């Protein structure tokens, strides 16, 4: 019988610490009154255009470098269309096809043994709203 090796993949989300949202000038603060930290762009009002937050790009690039990823020559963003209750626009701005970092690797020590952790990609994307459930 052929030896099999388990490969476990994890998707991790990190909230960017910044003054404003990734593509919107609206304040980036979670624990405030609902529907107060919004801008016309967050609701896809006609004529509104996103502007990427430079602070967020710098932080994502720093993470990409720290994890030994390859960085692209240009930043490209995609519009991912889907319906979800906390997605007021009906689409999400993301880097689904052209991430800010790809093919990374870090080594970790486990029981005196060095093991590689491979990073598929790091990408910026918006989460323009959230649902809070209090029971």
Please give the residue ranges for each predicted region.
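Basic, nucleic-acid-interacting segments
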Residues: 1-135
């Amino acid at each position: 019988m052929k030896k099999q090796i388990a490969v476990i993949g994890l998707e991790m989300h990190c909230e960017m610490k910044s003054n404003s949202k990734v593509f919107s000038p609206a304040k980036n603060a979670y624990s405030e009154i609902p529907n107060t930290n919004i801008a016309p762009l967050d609701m896809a009002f006609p004529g509104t255009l996103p502007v990427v937050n430079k602070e967020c790009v710098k932080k994502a690039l720093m993470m990409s470098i720290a994890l030994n990823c390859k960085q692209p020559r240009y930043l490209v963003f995609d519009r991912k269309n889907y319906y979800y209750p906390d997605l007021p626009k009906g689409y999400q701005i993301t880097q689904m096809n052209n991430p800010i970092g790809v093919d990374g690797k870090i080594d970790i020590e486990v029981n005196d043994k060095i093991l590689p952790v491979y990073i598929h990609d790091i990408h910026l994307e918006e989460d323009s709203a959230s649902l809070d459930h209090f029971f």
